[in-house]
Each structure stands twice: as structure tokens, then as C-alpha cells.
């Protein structure tokens, strides 16, 4: 309606058109400020750069309109600018997209500076042990479980929240990694082939966990085989002295041969030659009791408040890596018992 009234006024009286546009803009701004959003916009440095670039584009469009259509009459010039700004407002999403596109070389240069700084920080910590975690699902839970167990013996940092892309990992390194950290657990997500390899080239993990290979993000990967290849970029990047822990409960993992590094397979469902197994799983009112069996006759009886095979599988991976890294059985047993279930996810509810 506002655009219709503006168009009508612009043909009858340009000054009225500009006044109408000003009123409409002011009302829109007030509504924007007072509106409550579920997740408000965070004004990061990049967001500010995009909005400034968008404003500059609007000014340039307004100036061009004035020069082309304004002529020598002041009122026509003002009308041309008002019309241009109205068009910019209606196409604000296109303006911001164009600003983002124009800033791409600048953002690339800035991001590369952040990456170089992160590399330098990692290079200054040669004794830091890096564990990579990836998978179609289960990687976040495994990351948290492993962090809880390793923290019993090591000063351990994990990538927080959804900081699981290259730049998210870079931000974690620059803002959270401290010289006294001993272990760095890196969750790695991928939407395209090469994404995990890029993160590995940055952090150089010595241990890798592949929790699952499933039909996730097929719109970008194209096939389950490409998903498998991308998840195993983590395993392919490990040094010969490292170790890969892979979940043989998934056929696309069990069928994948690994020859470049020691490969330790784990399973909750059947043996299938896996080195690590969760057996004798019993669900109780207080959680789950189960036994973990590993190489060289290793065995440990555990109790957790968690429920469900998926949680036990993720716990199994975390326990296997912890044992590999030298965490004692008593510390593992205590940490596993202390892990809290995620709210609304297979947690026990007691009623009167």
C-alpha cells in the first residue's frame, strides 16, 4: 500500500512523494527497532562491513539517478534520489547480496589473516594433542563425552557449540586455546567434499573418530559414496603414528579399508572383528550398565545415566580413545558415571 501511494504521489507532486517516503521509512525503522526476534541479529564486524557497503551502494545509486534523470531542476533531482532510495529499499536484499559479493575479496583476505594467526598459535604448541571428530551424526555427543573423560587427566579444550567449520575452528584457536592446554578436541563438519581436509590441514590431528556415515547433505554431496569419502578425509589426514577410531555399526564405515594409519574399529551390535565392543548392555531405571571390551584383554564395567544405543556407541568411542591416550580405568569409570543426559533426549523422568 505504501509503495502504491508513493507511486501515485510521485506522478502528482514529487515533494509529497519524498515526504511519504520519509514517513514510511521512519515507521518501518521504529517497527524494526521495537520488534522482538527469536534470535536477534548479532552485529559482527562482517555484518557491519556488509551494511556499510550496502549503504554506500545505495548512495551511489541515488547519485547516479540524480545525474541521469535529475537534469538542472532541484525538485527533479530530489525526486530522482527519492525514487532511487525507494527502489533500494524495496530491493534491500539484493543490495546486501551485491555488497556481500563485492566484499568477497576483502573477506577472503581477512579470513586468511585469521587462519595464519591460528596456524602460528598451533605451531607454538608442539606438544598439543589434537583429536578430530566427524560423522553424519553423533559427533557432537562424542565430542562432549570425550571432553568429560579426558578432562579427568588432561587440560582439555573442545570446539564449543557449532564452531565446527574451518573458520569456527580458527575462532576457537584464537579466542579459547591457551598455552597450558594439553588436548584439543576438534569437531569437524562438512557440506562439500574437501571441507574436512581443509580443517585437518589447519589442526593436524593425530587421532580421528568417525562416528557415522549416513545420507546427510546429499543435496551437496550427491551420493552416499561422496559422504563416505569426505568423512574419511579425517582418517586419510592422520599421520602414520596416529590412530583412527571408526564405527563399524555403519556399513559404509565397515566396508572402508584403512591402510595409512592404525585403525581401531568399535561396535555395539556385533563383533565383526572390531577391536572395541560394548557388550552386556542392560537398561535400568537409573540409566545403563554395560561392559567395554578392548584389545589385549582390556575390560571395564561402566554405568551411565544415559539411555539408548546411540549414546552407548558414542560413549564407546570416547572410552576407546581415552584408554588409547592413557587415561586410567578408575577415572574413566567416574567420568562416565557423571555425564548428564541432554535435556529432552532419552532422559529418565521420575514422577510421584
Q: How should each PLM-predicted stretch be described?
A:
Residues 2-43, 49-248, 252-260, 316, ...:
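Phosphate-binding loop of NTP-binding sites
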Residues 210-352:
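Acidic, Mg2+-coordinating active-site environments of NTP-dependent enzymes
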Amino acid at each position: 500500500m505504501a509503495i502504491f501511494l508513493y507511486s501515485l504521489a510521485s506522478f502528482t507532486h514529487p515533494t509529497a512523494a519524498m515526504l511519504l517516503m520519509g514517513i514510511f521509512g521512519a515507521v518501518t525503522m521504529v517497527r524494526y527497532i521495537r520488534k522482538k526476534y527469536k534470535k536477534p541479529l548479532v552485529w559482527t564486524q562482517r555484518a557491519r562491513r556488509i551494511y556499510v557497503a550496502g549503504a554506500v551502494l545505495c548512495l551511489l545509486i541515488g547519485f547516479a539517478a540524480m545525474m541521469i534523470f535529475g537534469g538542472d531542476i532541484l525538485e527533479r533531482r530530489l525526486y530522482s534520489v527519492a525514487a532511487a532510495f525507494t527502489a533500494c529499499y524495496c530491493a534491500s536484499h539484493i543490495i546486501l547480496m551485491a555488497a556481500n559479493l563485492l566484499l568477497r575479496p576483502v573477506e577472503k583476505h581477512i579470513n586468511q589473516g585469521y587462519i595464519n594467526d591460528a596456524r602460528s598459535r598451533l605451531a607454538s604448541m608442539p606438544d598439543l594433542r589434537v583429536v578430530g571428530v566427524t560423522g553424519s551424526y553423533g559427533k557432537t555427543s562424542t565430542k562432549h563425552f570425550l571432553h568429560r573423560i579426558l578432562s579427568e587427566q588432561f587440560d582439555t579444550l573442545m570446539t564449543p557449540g557449532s564452531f565446527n567449520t574451518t573458520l569456527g575452528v580458527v575462532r576457537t584457536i584464537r579466542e579459547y586455546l591457551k598455552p597450558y592446554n594439553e588436548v584439543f578436541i576438534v569437531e569437524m563438519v562438512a557440506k562439500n567434499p574437501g571441507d574436512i581436509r581443509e580443517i585437518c590441514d589447519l589442526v593436524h590431528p593425530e587421532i580421528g573418530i568417525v562416528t557415522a556415515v549416513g545420507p546427510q547433505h546429499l543435496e551437496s554431496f550427491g551420493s552416499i559414496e561422496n559422504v563416505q569419502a569426505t568423512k574419511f578425509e579425517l582418517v586419510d589426514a592422520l599421520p602414520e603414528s596416529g590412530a583412527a577410531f571408526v564405527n563399524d555399526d555403519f556399513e559404509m564405515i565397515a566396508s572402508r579399508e584403512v591402510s595409512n594409519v592404525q585403525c581401531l574399529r568399535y561396535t555395539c551390535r556385533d563383533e565383526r572383528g572390531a577391536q572395541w565392543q560394548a557388550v552386556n548392555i542392560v537398561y535400568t531405571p537409573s540409566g545403563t550398565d554395560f561392559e567395554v571390551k578392548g584389545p589385549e584383554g582390556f575390560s571395564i564395567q561402566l554405568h551411565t545415566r544415559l539411555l539408548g544405543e546411540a549414546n552407548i556407541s558414542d560413549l564407546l568411542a570416547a572410552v576407546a580413545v581415552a584408554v588409547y591416550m592413557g587415561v586410567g580405568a578408575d577415572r574413566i569409570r567416574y567420568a562416565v558415571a557423571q555425564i548428564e543426559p541432554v535435556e529432552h533426549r532419552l532422559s529418565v523422568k521420575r514422577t510421584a
